[in-house]
Design a protein with these regions (language model features):
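A short glycine-rich beta-alpha junction/loop motif
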Residues: 108-115, 148-175
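Short, positively charged
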Residues: 125-160
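A short beta-sheet element
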Residues: 92-134
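Non-catalytic DNA-recognition/assembly elements of restriction-modification systems
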Residues: 1-46, 168-182
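Short, surface-exposed loop/turn microsegments at beta-strand edges and helix-strand junctions
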Residues: 39-47, 67, 81-83, 100-113
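Sequence-specific dsDNA recognition surfaces
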Residues: 22-37, 54-85
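A structural connector/turn signal
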Residues: 75-78, 104, 151
Length: 182
């Protein structure tokens, strides 16, 4: 079978579908903050930034954290990768987990230590994907292989994330799993 298209196979009598993540989603690397700074302060607009520490705090039930901001060149605002409700972010450095963005994250800049993922309508429940990426044994194995090395900073590559094979049961099954996980 080729990794370039969906694979149908039989598992316990049912047809299963698998897709490359890049086939069913829009994957966008976060922005390098230094590249969006205005040359002149008066030409900038202030935007909140999504951080790994915010996501970790939220996982631990802490909601009263400080939100850092960045001054953005007004000409570059339309090209910003901003957080949207129900999209996914994956931490590329240290965090190495998928998180579903909620209403409180909307409009925050997604910086370069994240990749954001938006699924094509009706293909993937974001909460199911978070479970699949964070907990599925095969994905955990792939993540561990990807972050091995001699470097003190363990980084996931955007290419590795794009090439992940994702099992896609029907949407109602995905939603059931996602509800249990979140």
């Amino acid at each position: 079978t080729s990794r370039d298209y969906q694979i149908n196979y039989f598992y316990e009598g049912a047809v299963r579908l698998e897709f490359l993540l890049e086939q069913i989603s829009q994957i966008t690397h976060g922005v390098v903050l230094n590249r969006i700074k205005p040359k002149i302060l008066s030409e900038g607009a202030e935007y909140p930034i999504l951080t790994i520490s915010q996501l970790i705090d939220e996982e631990n039930g802490v909601w009263d954290y400080e939100v850092p901001t960045a001054l953005v060149d007004k000409k570059k605002v339309k090209n910003l990768n901003l957080a949207k409700e129900h999209s996914i972010v994956i931490g590329l450095t240290s965090f190495h987990r998928a998180a579903v963005l909620e209403k409180q994250h909307e409009g925050k800049i997604i910086p370069s230590n994240f990749v954001s993922i938006e699924f094509q309508n009706g293909i993937m429940d974001p909460y199911y994907f978070a479970w699949y990426f964070n907990e599925h044994p095969e994905i955990k194995r792939q993540r561990m292989i990807a972050i091995q090395g001699n470097s003190s900073v363990k980084v996931l590559s955007v290419h590795m994330i794009r090439q992940l094979m994702i099992e896609c049961p029907n949407l109602s099954t995905q939603m059931s799993i996602g509800k249990l996980y979140y």
